[in-house]
Every structure is written in structure tokens, then in C-alpha cells.
Amino acid sequence: ILIGLVGSEMCIRDRTRVVMEHTGRYYEAVAKALHEAGFFVCAVNPLLIKEYGANSLRRVKTDKADAVKIARYALDNWADLRDFTPMDAIRYDLKTLNRQFQLASKQRTASANNLIALLEQSFPGIRKCFDSPVRSDGTQKWVDFAHSFWHVDCVRKQPFPAFCERYRKWCKRHAYLFKLSNAEEVYALAKRAVVLTPKSKVVKVLVQEAANQLISISRSVEVYRAEMDRLAAMLPEYPVVMAMYGVGKSYGPQLMAEIGDVRRFERKQALVAFAGIDPMPNQSGDKNVRSNKSSKRGSPYLRKTLFNVIRTYLQCAPQDEPVFQFLNRKRAEGKPFYVYMLAAANKFLRRYYAKLRDYFASLDTLQSVDPIPTTLKASL
């Protein structure tokens, strides 16, 4: 059908516009092919199509009904349709990596909870004895320890000097720091532990396979994180984003992946609406709610990253940072936790937009690389 449409003499490209919903990823190949063939292509937010022209009591959901609805939307908004332009390769790869990173992070959390639950049956409380962070290869001390010492009997069935020497060799073999106090803490925990399951081959398989699964997923997470930072460093706004407080080599590439090129947003309110942290006005007659909920109709991945950035402000409390000053003022006013956190995220996003717009304005030769994929006019 596409080949026939491109080669059709009846199709006047200057007067033909292709409008589609940008659902998932399967629309991108079609939109790119038609765009390269010279057609005007517009990818519309599915929510705008869903809420458009809902003037019937019947709920019909067929391909034909959806096509008619999209066509009516296109005719009514003909002058406001935005031409689709494919995203450049770096930003596209960065966004894809970020989505895989977020998925792997969820899987790592689930795998860690699963391993902790299994250890509560064979070695309860061992997780709290270690606080080492995840290394660049995805390994973590408590996970490797659980793989080798998967039951309390692996520790308490031998004298403390023998366990201490074995633990010292284990730390050297896995390149971990040996602490005598840590060995004493683990041995004391094993001595007083009350376990549900006895030492058996089944318990060994369960714990070790859960540990292997967690290590594998953690390694994937760290690979994604390093690759995202490498790709983000190729973008022109990388030094400006990384110079902002609360943004490091993990959160910076995530922000750049989800926001894209800020020049595609006409003003800062559009970026706030894109993130879904804009307040929804609630007024009817004499009712006028002053504390409104956020719309949450934007990218959930972007909102999660913003929340983590603001949590960094909350933990470090930089007194000279405008975002923290704004957050602290809202907290002093007695606002609830999520209210002042979202307000601070809104403030951070506006500063992000202003800094990058000023930076891009200083680069006269730099061209925009990716336009906004949705019609934001209705979201503002």
C-alpha cells in the first residue's frame, strides 16, 4: 500500500497530509518512509485523538472507526498540524538505551527482593551486614557473599579463626576490602540466627541461581549506564547539563534522553506539560481549588528522573542553590511532601530549559536535530 501510495500519480504531495497516532514504536518506520518520500506526515498524541469528537454514547473500537476519527481530527486541525521529522541517530539510540536501562533497573530491584526473601529462609539479616555499592561490572559484595555462603551453616559450623581466614581469602579473590569487624559481625549473626530451611542442595541451587540472576541483570544495568553516558557526551548540551547541581553521569543522560532537544519546545510551559508535572486547574462556579494535582500525562520516565534529582537536593541541602531554596520555602509553608517535590521539579525543569536555550542561542551554527513528536498546543 505504501509503495503504491508513493508511486501514485493521483496523490498530490503538496496537498496530501498523512496523520497517524504515535503509538509504541511501529509507527516510526512508516512515518520515516513517507517523510523521505516527500509527504507531509504528522504523528499525533493518541490521547488527543481519544478525547476528540467523543459526542456519541456508543463505544466503538474498530480500525475503521479509528481511521475516520483520525481523519476528522486532521481536517479540523489542518492548519495546526506539525510536520514529522525523524529524530537523529544519537538521540534515538540514547532514548532507546534509557528505556532498556529503566526496564533492567526494575528487573534488578525485583531480583534483589527475591534474593533477600530467599536469604531470609537460609541466612536471615545478612543483607544488612554489607553496604558496598554496585561496582562497574555489576557485582556487589553482599550478592557475591550470599553466592559463596548461602546458608548460616556455611559460617557457624566452623570456628571463628577458620571462618575469618576463609573470609579474608574470599575478599582477596573477589577484590573486596577485608574488615575484621565485618567478619565478627557476620559470624555473630550466623551464631544467633534462627533459620527456616536446613542446609540442602535445593537451598543452594535456589540462592546461587538467584544471585547469578541478580549479578547478570546488574551487569546489564551498568553497561547501559556507561553506554548512555558515552552517547550523551556526543550531544552539544552535555557540558551544560552535567554542570547543573544534582545531575551526574546517571541522571544527566536520562534527562537528555527523555527531553531531547529543548529547542523543539516553544516555551518552558511546553516542557513542563511534556513532563506531566503541570497543575490541572479545577474551577467550577464558586468552587476554585488552589492546590491542584499534576496532570501526569507526560513521560513517566522523565518524572521518575526528575524526582530522583530533586531527592538529591533534599538529601544534600545545598543552601546556595535556587531550586533547594524554593523547595525549602515550600516545605516551610507546610506543603505535603509530594507537593513541594513536584513544585521543585517544575522549578528545576524551567531552569533546565532556560540554561539550554541560552546555550544554544550562543551557538549560531548549530541546527535543531529533532522536532517535538506530539502536538503540544492542546496540552498547554
Question: Where are these predicted regions, by residue range?
Answer:
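Short glycine-rich phosphate-binding loop at a beta-alpha junction
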Residues: 15-26
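Phosphate-backbone recognition surface of nucleic-acid-processing proteins
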Residues: 163, 170, 239-243, 249-333, ...
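Short alpha-helix plus adjacent loop in nuclease-associated cores
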Residues: 35, 42-83, 151, 287-297
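Basic, amphipathic alpha-helical segments enriched in Lys/Arg and hydrophobic/aromatic residues
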Residues: 331-380
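Single conserved hydrophobic/aromatic residue that forms the stacking wall/gate
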Residues: 1-12
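Glycine-rich, often acidic, oxyanion-interacting loops/wings at catalytic, nucleic-acid
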Residues: 101-238
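A short, charged helix-loop
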Residues: 71-96, 189-194
